[in-house]
């Protein structure tokens, strides 16, 4: 079942009316965070923008140097300090903020490819670890005016996750192995850190 976008959009409008600006959507890999965030921004229209956490992936060369390339997507494979700094600048609402965007066709973040305008009414940021209580990551939650946790049944989420990896070049066997070894441990971290969400959205 898909979340009721009309009800969610109403909640977002109430958030902005109260003076809120930054909405965070957390969830496990494959839960549908990007899809929901994009739908909200498109439904809002002019005045809403995305700020995806995925743009702060460390580069593959850096992951190789740190010997973390075999678990890309884990909390310590992101530039969490850069993400927190970007959110902090967005919250000050004083100037446009340039942020990176993750290009899945390249499996790399492209610096300065998204501009969050100072005039933007609503900024929707989404990612796995927005509610994670860990060094660096615990600084994210205070920067969100509201935080949602998107939850999907594993029977729906895992096959979609495998299909995504296959679509980006992995064999079915390799995709399933990656999901089991990397994505599912990350999903467990997300589930364990869900207590600070203002709203749980199920699909």
Each language-model region and where it sits:
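Active-site signature of alpha/beta-hydrolase-fold catalytic machinery across serine-
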Residues: 39
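Extreme N-terminal, non-catalytic leader segments
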Residues: 1-24, 28
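Hydrophobic positions on the alpha1 helix immediately C-terminal to the Walker A/P-loop
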Residues: 36
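Conserved nucleotide-sensing/catalytic segment adjacent to the nucleotide-binding pocket
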Residues: 52, 59-106
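Conserved lysine of the Walker
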Residues: 33
